[in-house]
């Protein structure tokens, strides 16, 4: 667990400094050449800095151990900050959407510079490296903040490729409206990406139940025990990445209290070995 928090912290810091570098160079060249797609890319980098900063802060809070007032730890902090990230992304995308539409209406052109192409290539390489690194960490630790950042880096590679296409089409083929269209596409992409993160974070914060397959597997495991007649009133409460399970097992009414509680204790230990389960609470109902 400690390694996961350290890895997420490192990924957050790399994202902050990498995106800050890209924001500065893209913002300068974008305003200098009046390229809406490059300005859009710079705004996207600004949102990426916020996302990486939220990753860093959220990871720090969620790594705090359990205490008297937070009995199950601080795992949901990651989802709270992921929610902030998504709202920021969607807000910036709406601003960018309006600017791009106005640019298409006004038929604004941009001033070509070879630096536009150079910065696009630098961005693609930088973001590709950040994506590969962060995606590997996400696969290893299954962290929503790492997942959000990895998807963000991947999207940036594709979006900057679109920016590069708009620059080439505008300068070499005289199709300047592509610049505004690409800005429009980038804004929509950012919004959709933010919406996906928002929904995932919202579901956890609203105590969405465990996935149906895992639930079915656990109930099947419980019912396989010869002394369990049925498994009812199954509840799964998320506490960050893991879940607290509460359910009732029906046992033979002739079974002693001692034996029924030993059975419940055995099942609790067995189920707690599952990677998604933090704690299991079983109520015994003699029938």
Give the residues covered by each predicted segment:
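Alpha-helical transmembrane segments and adjacent TM-loop junctions that form the membrane-embedded core
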Residues: 2-18, 22-25, 32-33, 37-43, ...
